[in-house]
UniProtKB/Swiss-Prot annotation:
Residues 120-141, 148-170 have a biased composition (Acidic residues). SMART domains: DEXDc, HELICc. ATP binds at residues 293-300. GO terms for biological process: rRNA processing. This is ATP-dependent RNA helicase MAK5. A motif (Q motif) lies at residues 249-277. Keywords: ATP-binding, Helicase, Hydrolase, Nucleotide-binding, Nucleus, Ribosome biogenesis, RNA-binding, rRNA processing. A motif (DEAD box) lies at residues 411-414. Gene3D superfamilies: P-loop containing nucleotide triphosphate hydrolases. It comes from Phaeosphaeria nodorum (strain SN15 / ATCC MYA-4574 / FGSC 10173) (Glume blotch fungus). The Q motif is unique to and characteristic of the DEAD box family of RNA helicases and controls ATP binding and hydrolysis. Its EC number is 3.6.4.13.
Amino acid sequence: MKRAHKAPKASHKAHKRQKVEKKPRPEINVPKRKIRLDDLGWNQVSMPDRLEDFEGFYGLEEIEDVHVVKDAVTGNLSFETTKTDEQIEQDIEKAWQREEEEAKFLEKITFGGEPKNGEDVVEEETAPVEDTVEATQDEDAASWGGFSDDDVAQNGDEQSEDVQMVEEDAPPTPNVVLSTTKADGDGEAEPKKMNKRERAAEKKRIAALAKKTKKPDDDEASEGKTFGPGAFDILANRADDEDDEVDVSAWEELELSTKILESLAKLKFSKPTTIQASTIPEIMAGRDVIGKASTGSGKTLAFGIPIIESYLASKSKSKDVKDKTPLALIIAPTRELAHQITAHLTALCAKGAFEAPLIASVTGGLAVQKQRRQLEKADIIVGTPGRLWEVISTGHGLLEKVKQIRFLVVDEADRLLSQGNYKELGEILKILEKDAPAEGEAEAEETTEVERQTLVFSATFQKGLQQKLAGKAKGGSDNLMSKQQSMEYLLKKINFREEKPKFIDANPSSQMASKLKEGLIECAGTEKDLYLYSLLMFYPKKRALIFTNSISAVRRLTPFLQNLALPALPLHSSMAQKARLRSIERFKERPGSILVATDVAARGLDIPKVELVIHYHLPRAADTYVHRSGRTARAEASGSSILICAPEEVGGVRRLIAKVHARADEAPKSKKTAYFIRTLDIDRRIVARLKPRASISKKLADTVIAKEKKHSEDDTLRQAAEDLGVDYDSEEFEKEAKGKKGRGTGRKKKEKEASEMTKGEQQALRAELRGLLSQRINTGVSARYLTSGGIDVDALMAGEGNMEFLGNVDGLGFDEE
């Protein structure tokens, strides 16, 4: 019997078993050593039986007891193991045995039939010839009773010779395996049926045997003889053909050098544009030039070719870097335009058979020290005013070198010279205008005066175009400025060498491209997102550029379009330089991508095959509209520019049309069409069917933005409270702010509601949006009876037309005359 325990007292604590802590066993320090992964014996990964095939993981292997070590300094990866040499050799031997077993198994499934009891399958790759002959003799003796042993012995040598002949001359077929099987009664065994796994193994086996049984005499038999041209001959002939494809005889009238003509031929520029044919001879003659041409007309090469010609004509032979001075200074308003000018000049020089000049790009977002080193050796300097002045003014000796330039180019001059902008440009121009010697210098000292040419280019020179469209219209004439008025406007800003520089206007009658189609869509201010999405549905898989007036609009529209499965990319001035370049590169690479940008992308960007430009907001000035629309219909291509107009923007749109499409005094008064900007009508039924998608996407985008804004505000207030030594409580702060009413309270209430949305609610909205996006937009046809009419079934099956809609969709009216 068990001994009775005493009754526990309330004052005594209950007895508990004391937990014995197990001490960790001391780790045995096993020495590790570096080893190559190829020197280890790998184990095969067994696949589950439920899979019919390996699903792309055929031959998957694994290894154990190997550590991956990354060097903290260099970042290189190395592999270490604790196994000894004996263990590694055992693993390798097991791996070889496994591979031999796999090879035998492949032999069985490849050539049909299974070996009988007591028979071995002899492989050509592993079994030597002598063993093969002996095995064949034994099997013949056991299988055939009609021949004597003497006959078999006499034919042994002949059989070995036959085996050797098979080894040498066997074709790349699976019949090279030497094996014999017994005949059972009726005859030969039927071939075994193979599944997917066995068929894949068979294909690999046949390919390996074909590679190993290739005759070495085939290459020797055709020694000294070629059957057609070689690879290098084909490439050489192809390069010659490409060079001869373009005829550059139209450029010969400009008296360019042979090297430049070769570069133009390789770049496939068959003839000069109007601005190029007009300005290049004047610049090469030494004149100061003011060039006005529509966007996309080739203004970069108009001043780039004469600069390269001057570099080739007066190439400095001095190898001393200190004596080297830059040839040209090109100033652009934005980083993107400066990088694009650099890329165009580099491409022109790279295609030529001459030593290219050193081109330095000086823009913000990059290291100042590196740019300063590049300026010391540069032949051509391209940059923005702010960073140029920062680098030049803080450098040692760079100011004196910049004063020796022979070409000063001001691209997009209307923006650079506008009042109140780019103060650094004024400082640079003042430095270049100081030609007189200092007071302390002796009069006898000779000062070398530099013959500098000043080249000014832009698409707009009208001062009235820079006025705000949202303001009240001022009295007076808003017609295009004449040549005399434009020159007076520029002579006040820039000190030209000549009293009357050459003014060249390539498009006096219009400032827009000839093949540009302009359209206008009227909608409510709160429905701009919906009509933007509807408009993009009519242009599927086409590269589009959307312009806004604010960075916040870019940050809101980009996730809004991304939620709708559209490849949208952002671009604005607050982005890092690398992120801006990344967005532009992705926009160029993807054919149907969409770029949502501010006016930082309105000037100079040359992106090929941009078919659509959408103005989400009315531009602040008319010249901005001209440059925005100039991103499409470039280089004689066609394009569309569509403005989404809210009721409060109607007055600004009227002033925009009056300013942009006004006629100059000397322009011919011919009118081809009865309108300048066509009003486009989108089917309201289609817009109504797209509204649920747009509403959900807008909710999701607003939620993400509201949450980010709340976190940033909390961080700012919390940091301010810590600086003041006060405790910050967000709930108390909101209670005190509840009583305040005024402008913006409704917006703040919506932002608060959006920021409080849970993850579950967001996932539910995303699932609902995915369901809507998986369906086509029905234009009013019967989805159950597709052949009843209204649907082109042949086009639907072939995947032709606009695949976003179910049914026929009319265009927006651009094609109607």
